Amino acid sequence: MEINYELYLITDRRFLKGRQLKKVVEDAILGGVTIVQVREKDVSTKEFYNVAKEVKEVTDYYRVPIIINDRLDIAQAIDANGVHLGQKDMHLNIAREILGKDKIIGISVGNVKEALEAQNNGADYLGIGTIFPTGSKKDVDAIIGIDGLSKIKDSISIPSVAIGGINKTNFKDVLKTGIEGISVISAILDEDDIKLAANNLLINK
C-alpha cells in the first residue's frame, strides 16, 4: 500500500462530544484525512481492541491506512497497517521482529539524534514534535518550533509528519519545511464540522 502522509489524524475520544467515533473518522476521511492512528490511553485491552476494530471498518472501506499507537498486540489482532512508537515504547528492532517487514513502523522523535537513530534502525516514517504548544498532550518535554522541525527534516531521508499544536492558521508554515504531512488531533476532532475542519488543513484543496 502506497502511504500518503499528507493529513494524519490521531484519534482521541475525549473530543467526541457525544458523536460516534466511526462517523467522526469517516467524516475526517471524506474531508481529506489520508491516514489514521488509533490512540487510546488508560483503557482495557478489550476496549482498545473494540475501538480499533470499529475504526478499521471505516479505514478499510475507504482504503486508508490504520496505525495503532504503541500496542503491537492490538495491531496484530486487527491486522492494522502498522504501529506508532514513542521513545519510551518497545524498541523498533523488536517491534520489527514481531510485526515483520511489511508493516509500517513510525517513531516519535524530538531531535536530530533520535531521528537519525530511528531512521538507521529501519523506521518507515517519523512523527516530529512537539512543534507548537498543545492541549492534547500534557507531557511535552520541549517545543521545537519550525526551526527545530527544519533541522530534523534536513537530517533524514525517510518520510515524516509534524505534530503538536498544528491548526489551520499555522499548517502552511509547517509544510514549507518540505515535510510530508501534518499530524493533528484537536484541529479536526474539536471542531463541529469534521469534514470541513479536515478540508481546511489541505494545502491543495
UniProtKB/Swiss-Prot annotation:
Cofactor note: Binds 1 Mg(2+) ion per subunit.
Keyword hit for Metal-binding: yes
Protein name per UniProt: Thiamine-phosphate synthase
Pfam entry (one): TMP-TENI
Binding site for Mg(2+): 70, 89
EC primary class: transferase
Family of the protein in this entry: Belongs to the thiamine-phosphate synthase family.
Ligand binding (4-amino-2-methyl-5-(diphosphooxymethyl)pyrimidine): 37-41, 69, 108, 137
The UniProt record lists the keyword Lipid metabolism: no
EC number(s) stated in the UniProt entry for this protein: 2.5.1.3
Cofactor needs: Mg(2+)
Protein source organism: Clostridium botulinum (strain 657 / Type Ba4)
Pathway involvement of the protein, from the record: Cofactor biosynthesis; thiamine diphosphate biosynthesis; thiamine phosphate from 4-amino-2-methyl-5-diphosphomethylpyrimidine and 4-methyl-5-(2-phosphoethyl)-thiazole: step 1/1
GO terms of biological process kind: thiamine biosynthetic process; thiamine diphosphate biosynthetic process
